[in-house]
Amino acid sequence: MLTTQLQAIKTGIAAAQARGLDVPAENALLFRTLLLVGRAVGTLADEAIRPSGLLEAEFRVLMQLYSRPDGVGHPGELCAGSAHSPANISRITDTLVARGLISRSASEQDRRRMILRVAAEGEELIRRFVPSAFRQIGTLFATLSAESRAQLLAQLDEIAAAYDQMTGDEPAC
């Protein structure tokens, strides 16, 4: 259980401090909690989409493409918005094309530029799996008020911005 694991983390941080380790307990707890909850939510997401037959990364790229105007995009856009390398986007889109979930064609304006489009089968898969997956995942947030959810989102945005500033992280594409 996550609550048991979080308690063990708190106990471990206190024990490390008692042994003389100079670590800010609150920062250590925030860091470890984010990691633990993030992994657990990722596992829940994997389980929710498993019946679709897609891996989480494939499903996320399909959803990202579906969420674009007219379900059309380019590999570079998918790369920038998904934190995947160009090579991984290529592999993922190859898989989605092979399964008939998206189509790939060359741009009429620039034959070197690929156009990716969600196919009817991809739209059907999304319409079939997304509502139930998000209902399942949504139960995690049901105990939070609308105000608490908005605050959590704002705080996560702040953490993401601080991370970007700290690392200078730019998309690989």
Task: Annotate each language-model stretch with its function.
Residues 41, 82, 125, 129-144, ...:
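Alpha-helical linker/hinge and terminal dimerization helices associated
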Residues 31, 35, 39, 83, ...:
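Short amphipathic alpha-helical segments with heptad-repeat character
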Residues 23-26, 54-56, 118, 144:
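Alpha-helical hairpin
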